[in-house]
Curated annotation (Swiss-Prot):
Lineage, opening ranks: Bacteria, Bacillati, Bacillota, Bacilli, Lactobacillales
GO BP term (any one): phosphate ion transmembrane transport
Xref: InterPro entries: AAA+_ATPase, ABC_transporter-like_ATP-bd, ABC_transporter-like_CS, P-loop_NTPase, PstB-like
Subunit composition and interactions: The complex is composed of two ATP-binding proteins (PstB), two transmembrane proteins (PstC and PstA) and a solute-binding protein (PstS).
Record keywords: ATP-binding, Cell membrane, Membrane, Nucleotide-binding, Phosphate transport, Translocase, Transport
The protein's name: Phosphate import ATP-binding protein PstB 2
Gene Ontology CC: plasma membrane
Localization (cell): Cell membrane
The encoding gene: pstB2
Organism whose genome encodes this protein: Lactococcus lactis subsp. lactis (strain IL1403)
Length: 269
C-alpha cells in the first residue's frame, strides 16, 4: 500500500552562517495569471556554498531557480510575488535593472548552449559589446574565465575553433566560463550535467567544488548521488512547496521528515 505523507509538515534550516548571498521571502510564482507553481517559499543561501534543489519532476525546483535571477520574466503570463533579497535589495521590484541582476546572478542551463562562434568569441563578444576594445584586455578575460572553468589547458591552442565542435562536457564548461566572465557573485545551474556522460559529469562537479571558493552556487539536480557528493546544503521540493531544507549530510542520513527520507532513498520520484 502506498505511503501517505503529511505534506503540511516542514523543516526549514536557518543557516548558521552570518553571510547570506541570497534569500527569498514568501516567493510565489504564477503561470497564466492564476496557476500557482511555487507556494510561498522562504529560504536563505549561505555565501560560498553549494545548495542543491531536489525533488520529483514538476516539483517546482527549476521554476524557483529561474525566479532567482528573474528569468521567469521572459515567460508570457508568468508572475512572481514576494521578495528576492540580494545585497539588501529586493530584486523582484519593477524598478530593478534586470540585466544587471543577471550579470550578478548568472545562469547555466541544462543543455550546453554555446553560441555559433569560436571558443574565444563565445566569451569575448559579450565584453566587446559592452565596450571593451583592447585586445590584451579581451585576451585576459577569456583566459581567466576558461581557467576558472577548468577548460583553458584543453582549448588554449584551439581558441579559434568553433564552439559547436566541442564535446558536451567542454561545451558546458565553456558556458560556465562565459557566465563567470562577467564576474557574477552567484551562479545558478539547472541540471548542468544531466545531458553529459559520467566523466564529464565528474568534471563539472569538480569545477563546482573549486568555484565555490569565490562564488555561491545553487544547482537543480535529479541525481541524488550528485547532490550528496557536490553540495553543502540540500532543499527538497514537492508540488511547488519547500518541504525540507538542511545540511546535505543531514538530508541524506538523518532527514526530519519521512517524505524526504523516502525521496532521497528512491522510494518515489
Amino acid at each position: 500500500m502506498a505511503t501517505t505523507y503529511d505534506w503540511s509538515q516542514r523543516k526549514i534550516m536557518v543557516p548558521e552562517k552570518e553571510e547570506i548571498a541570497l534569500s527569498t521571502n514568501d516567493l510565489r510564482v504564477f503561470y497564466n495569471g492564476t496557476k500557482e507553481a511555487i507556494h510561498g517559499v522562504t529560504m536563505s543561501f549561505p555565501k560560498n556554498e553549494i545548495t542543491a534543489l531536489i525533488g520529483p519532476s514538476g516539483s517546482g525546483k527549476s521554476t524557483y531557480l529561474r525566479a532567482l535571477n528573474r528569468m521567469n520574466d521572459t515567460i508570457d503570463g508568468a508572475r512572481v510575488t514576494g521578495e528576492i533579497n540580494y545585497e539588501g535589495v529586493n530584486i523582484n521590484e519593477n524598478k530593478v535593472n534586470v540585466f544587471e541582476v543577471r550579470k550578478q546572478i548568472g545562469m547555466v542551463f541544462q543543455r550546453p548552449n554555446p553560441f555559433p562562434k569560436s571558443i574565444y568569441e563565445n566569451i569575448a563578444f559579450i565584453h566587446r559589446r559592452d565596450g571593451v576594445r583592447d585586445r590584451k584586455k579581451l585576451d585576459e578575460i577569456v583566459e581567466t574565465s576558461l581557467k576558472q572553468a577548468a577548460l583553458w589547458d584543453q582549448v588554449k591552442d584551439n581558441l579559434n575553433q568553433s564552439a559547436l565542435a566541442m564535446s558536451g562536457g567542454q561545451a558546458q564548461r565553456l558556458c560556465i566560463a562565459r557566465a563567470l566572465s562577467v564576474k557574477p557573485e552567484i551562479i545558478l545551474m539547472d541540471e548542468p550535467a544531466s545531458a553529459l556522460d559520467p566523466i564529464s559529469t565528474m568534471q563539472i562537479e569538480e569545477t563546482m567544488m573549486e568555484l565555490k571558493e569565490n562564488y555561491t552556487i545553487i544547482i537543480v539536480t535529479h541525481n541524488m548521488a550528485q547532490a550528496s557528493r557536490a553540495s553543502d546544503n540540500t532543499a527538497f521540493f514537492y508540488s511547488g512547496d519547500l518541504i525540507e531544507y538542511d545540511k546535505t549530510s543531514t538530508i541524506f542520513t538523518q532527514p526530519s521528515l519521512q517524505s524526504t527520507e523516502d525521496y532521497v532513498s528512491g522510494h518515489f520520484g
